[in-house]
Curated annotation (Swiss-Prot):
Cofactor note: Binds 1 zinc ion.
Organism: Staphylococcus epidermidis (strain ATCC 35984 / DSM 28319 / BCRC 17069 / CCUG 31568 / BM 3577 / RP62A)
GO molecular function, one term: ATP binding
Protein name as it appears in the record: Transcriptional repressor NrdR
Cofactor: Zn(2+)
Lineage top rank: taxon: Bacteria
Name of the gene encoding the protein in the UniProt record: nrdR
ZnF unnamed span: 3-34
Function: Negatively regulates transcription of bacterial ribonucleotide reductase nrd genes and operons by binding to NrdR-boxes.
């Protein structure tokens, strides 16, 4: 690792620990040349996921897009940012566990909605209204009826 201060390639590891639910290693290093301490992260190299969008175009999977959508859906709601990070991590690992290299944006949305429904139902409806592109209020109400019937079943 190059020192960010003097560009020396000679450093020693001072501390090492797991990060990101053991999917990465955080290392604290000290430059042997100038004594500067800096942090590096070692991540598992995973093959890229390709998202097939509704119009058929393909783009690289970006977890930040999921997180940004969740943040917008949960604005002014009692949802902690860490919960949104957890949902994003779970969705990404579910997709990678499926072993596919290409995944449709529809499948990603379904994964997100399944997890978000259990965190905050208002945020779920907000997310679903954008994701499912409701054409009118009737479609929105139909989606909400599904939530209400699920709640009644789980209350019994």
């Amino acid at each position: 690792m190059k020192c960010p201060k003097c560009n020396s390639t000679h450093s020693r590891v001072v501390d090492s620990r797991h990060a990101d639910e053991a999917n990465a290693i955080r290392r604290r290093r000290e430059c042997e040349n100038c004594g500067t301490r800096f942090t590096t992260f070692e991540h598992i190299e995973v093959s890229p996921l390709i998202v097939v969008k509704k119009d058929g175009t393909r783009e690289q999977f970006l977890r930040e897009k999921i997180l940004n959508g969740l943040v917008r859906s949960c604005e002014k709601r009692p949802v902690r940012y860490q919960q949104l990070e957890d949902i994003t991590n779970k969705v990404e690992w579910q997709l990678r566990d499926e072993g596919q290299t290409e995944i449709s944006s529809r499948e990603i949305g379904e994964h997100v909605m399944n997890l978000l429904m259990h965190v905050d139902q208002v945020s779920y409806v907000r997310f679903a209204s954008v994701y499912k592109e409701f054409k009118d209020v009737d479609q929105l109400l139909e989606s909400m009826q599904g939530i209400l019937s699920d709640n009644k079943r789980s209350d019994k």
